[in-house]
Swiss-Prot record:
This is 7-cyano-7-deazaguanine synthase. Catalyzes the ATP-dependent conversion of 7-carboxy-7-deazaguanine (CDG) to 7-cyano-7-deazaguanine (preQ(0)). Pathway: Purine metabolism; 7-cyano-7-deazaguanine biosynthesis. It comes from Methanocaldococcus jannaschii (strain ATCC 43067 / DSM 2661 / JAL-1 / JCM 10045 / NBRC 100440) (Methanococcus jannaschii). It catalyses: 7-carboxy-7-deazaguanine + NH4(+) + ATP = 7-cyano-7-deazaguanine + ADP + phosphate + H2O + H(+).
């Protein structure tokens, strides 16, 4: 029983990888380098997590994505910051548009599907969630269902994408992650990387970007100790 996880090194994909591991799958994690600012830190976080969990790790380079320009994640455009109380406001939608990378999930999930078919994996686990689904249309269960329809025709082994966190908030994801860490006897959440920036040191977060603020709020609301290193 084999599975692929799309592991960005972030909180959600780390918990999804824990879920796949807990379900007994032989897991291969894939991390994508598409020229994002934090690529080095994300890859190093994913590598550390895979080492702890004893799973195979594949890094796929997608240099052409930078040609899309536009997104603050792959250009020198300023990345917006948000206060915690603004995370559920209209301003969060504007921030989403600033960091949106054209067709990113379409590209990554398509490539992950190719690896899944080649490795005889039946499932691809991804970390889309309720909170980000509000602003990112490719973080919704509707997107997953539509993509799975494509995979019925695009793969011979009918590989299927699983999104076990699609209806969960970040708070619930942190709680679940902490429970799975305890169950599996591992500690990986503190090595996950959510920040949009490369802050010059592995696992070090800026503490100001939208992604960092969502991470901070999640741990705070979950009542789980946040062992993340923040600059602010």
């Amino acid at each position: 029983m084999k599975a692929i996880t799309v592991l960005s090194g972030g909180l959600d994909s780390t918990v999804v990888t824990l879920i796949a591991k807990d379900l007994g799958y032989e897991v291969t994690a894939i991390t994508f380098n598409y020229g994002q600012r934090a690529a080095k830190r994300e890859i190093n976080s994913a590598k550390k997590i895979c080492e702890i969990l004893g799973i195979e790790h594949i890094v796929v380079d997608l240099p052409f994505v930078k040609q899309f320009g536009k997104s603050s994640l792959i250009t020198e455009k300023e990345i917006p910051t948000l206060k915690m109380e603004e995370l559920d406001s209209e301003k969060a939608y504007e921030t989403m548009k600033a960091v949106w990378v054209p067709a990113r999930n379409v590209i990554m999930f398509g490539i992950a599907s190719g690896f899944a078919e080649a490795l005889d994996a039946e499932k691809i686990f991804i970390g889309i969630n309720k909170e980000e689904g509000v602003t990112f249309p490719d973080n919704t269960i509707e997107f997953v269902e539509a993509f799975n329809k494509v995979l019925e025709y695009g793969t011979l082994n009918k590989v299927k994408i699983e999104a076990p966190l699609y209806d969960k908030t970040k708070e619930e994801i942190v709680k679940l992650g902490a429970e799975l860490e305890k169950k599996l006897g591992v500690e990986v959440l503190k090595y996950s990387y959510s920040c949009y920036h490369d802050n010059g040191e592995d696992f070090l977060h800026c503490g100001k970007c939208e992604s960092c603020m969502r991470r901070k709020r999640a741990f705070l609301m979950a009542g789980v100790e946040d062992k993340t290193k923040y600059i602010e």
